[in-house]
Amino acid sequence: MDMLNLTLKPGCLSLNQLRQVSRSPINLSLDASAIPAIEESTQVVERVIAEDRTVYGINTGFGLLANTRIAPEDLETLQRSIVLSHAAGIGEFMADETVRLMMVLKINSLSRGYSGIRLNVIQMLIDLVNAQVYPCVPQKGSVGASGDLAPLAHMSTVLLGEGQARHNGKIISGLEALKIAGLEPITLAPKEGLALLNGTQASTAFALEGLFIAEDLFASATVCGAMSVEAALGSRRPFDPRIHRVRGHRSQMDSAMAYRHLLDTSSEIGQSHSNCEKVQDPYSLRCQPQVMGACLQQIRNSAEILLVESNSVSDNPLVFAEDDDIISGGNFHAEPVAMAADNLALAIAEIGSLSERRMALLIDSALSKLPPFLVDNGGVNSGFMIAQVTSAALASENKTLAHPASVDSLPTSANQEDHVSMATFAARRLREMGENTRGILAVEYLSAAQGLDFRAPHKSSPRIEQAKQMLREKVSFYDKDRYFAPDIEKANSLLKLAMHNVLMPEALLPSVL
């Protein structure tokens, strides 16, 4: 993938741009039209200080200490202290890709001109992104309100020459990170520490990654599902547009259309059993548009929410320069992100659950009319027997992980922050769930290709044959038992590259052009 050259117009990021940011390094610049609003909001903060007005986050403490007035000589110390004290996360570091996406989201939000932060602070974040210097940010420690305080604090420590960062896979000090980017440690002005820390950007970055994973899984599951229909000599009639039109769900209709797109009438396998006596297929084949359509709807709904959040201002307090006003609110509360992530979790789990059932059908000779466990000379050969057990284990694990996180809340900050979203965990677990579902799909991919080879000399449709050939370039037909795990890994690697997206109809998935 070519490096994205992105000129940021604050509040105008697209899902496709965000997908690219999450997948590869970028060259980022700020559109000049954003500068006046940034400078005007900074001037409002400067007037507050000059006029000795009391405003939360500028010259007061934070959280339960909001009523504590801070002396003018301590204001710079206040901003430095909030960054260092709030950098209290634990656990493994976020992936560089996640940190990059989080930083771009934070830059986008700050550049809207409602945060009272100076242009040179925003430019420092841009310079770090362009130098591919990514702060080391622990994954755990945020409850998604008041924003993602700990993760964003860890991000911000590097601006002070503190903390750690990663460059070319090597962990370095914050001071060394700045040197690589050609920067010096900064002294934060009033409001700037809080502006950097307040926001939903960590949760949203995790959730966006989950969205993009879910989209790729949807495409692969549709392709693998169509392959399984062919391998099991399933009927195409359940994909007839009339069935789905009378129900009326747009995503179900679109899902059925995707199966028709893959299973076109040129298939020799389809023609070979067009007059068979079988009346109905099991649900895992027949009800794919209904189940996958529901998953697609959750993906689309979540995409809409996350696109809005990605371009939002989730700081507090907010600076409205046109009114010379600063207002405390609660845009940092990540409930929309948490609920979107919970719905993505349901979709990812169901995509995997349905795939596992299709694979189980293929190895059952009574249902698929294929050799037991998809291998000749059964007994001597066990074939795909234990691969299905692996799929079942992964599907079961996802059922637990899919439990909604947004229904949980624990009060924090001495009950000042008495309801929180748990958005960070809601979104963070999507990667693990995606890996589980990708593993399930890898097993189905292998199984369906094996089943299709047993239907030779008949061939499937061109797109299904293309999908099978992608796999056969890496994994050969099973004529007898062999070491299985490497083949699952090869199939998994193909799925991780989102190779099946090109086989899908255009404009089906929100972030895929």
Curated annotation (Swiss-Prot):
Protein name: Histidine ammonia-lyase
Gene name as annotated: hutH
InterPro entries in UniProt: Aromatic_Lyase (IPR001106), Fumarase/histidase_N (IPR024083), HutH (IPR005921), L-Aspartase-like (IPR008948), Phe/His_NH3-lyase_AS (IPR022313)
Organism from which the protein derives: Vibrio vulnificus (strain CMCP6)
E.C. code: 4.3.1.3
UniProt entry keywords in alphabetical sequence: Cytoplasm, Histidine metabolism, Lyase
HAMAP family reported for this sequence: His_ammonia_lyase (MF_00229)
Record-level Gene Ontology MF annotations: histidine ammonia-lyase activity
A Pfam family that the UniProt record links to this protein: Lyase_aromatic
Family: Belongs to the PAL/histidase family.
Cellular location(s): Cytoplasm
Pathway named in the protein's UniProt entry: Amino-acid degradation; L-histidine degradation into L-glutamate; N-formimidoyl-L-glutamate from L-histidine: step 1/3
A cellular component term, taken from the record's GO annotations: cytoplasm
Top EC category: lyase
Residues joined by cross-link 5-imidazolinone (Ala-Gly): 145-147
Reaction equations catalysed: L-histidine = trans-urocanate + NH4(+)
Modified residues (2,3-didehydroalanine (Ser)): 146
PTM info: Contains an active site 4-methylidene-imidazol-5-one (MIO), which is formed autocatalytically by cyclization and dehydration of residues Ala-Ser-Gly.
GO biological process, one term: L-histidine catabolic process to glutamate and formamide
Membrane-spanning residues: none
